A protein has these predicted regions:
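C-terminal helical cap(s) of enzyme catalytic domains, especially alpha/beta-barrels
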Residues: 105-133
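Conserved alpha/beta-domain cores
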Residues: 1-102, 108-110, 122-124
Length: 133
């Protein structure tokens, strides 16, 4: 991951402002998802902050699906706590992206500044063959 960040920074044209980035956190430790483990985020953020072509804006996560509000809230609260802890050292962080259509209420109440609400706006996706491009 740091190799990718290094390349993004190095290839950012000097006449452009730094590239805004979020660190993806694998908040639930799911094997099917990418992202930095919560225990490694602080060190990763410190490294990213040193790249002149990048601007660390915050964190993002997609928690595991959960059936009830309390189960949905737990990883979101953990993300908020991690975000607040990192902001002490990286005060330029202003974005906490978490929550989608199914958990946007809990995400917003836990401090999300950005949510992805595609299904709530556009309806469910149609994966049938008739929709193939």
């Amino acid at each position: 991951r740091l190799r990718i960040a290094s390349r993004l920074s190095a290839q950012r044209p000097a006449d452009m402002p730094p590239l805004n980035i979020l660190i993806e956190v694998n908040i639930d430790g799911e094997e099917t998802k990418s992202g930095v483990a919560p225990s490694e985020v602080e060190a990763f953020a410190d490294e990213i902050a040193g790249y002149p072509g990048l601007k660390l804006r915050g964190l993002m996560a997609i928690p595991a699906p959960a059936a009830d509000s309390e189960s949905r809230r737990r990883p979101l609260a953990a993300m908020r706590a991690l975000f607040e802890r990192l902001r002490v050292k990286h005060p330029g962080m202003d974005t906490l992206s978490m929550g989608m259509s199914a958990d946007m209420d809990e995400a917003v109440s836990e401090g999300a500044t950005m949510v992805r609400v595609g299904r709530a706006v556009f309806g469910p996706r149609d994966y049938s063959a008739k929709c193939a491009v």
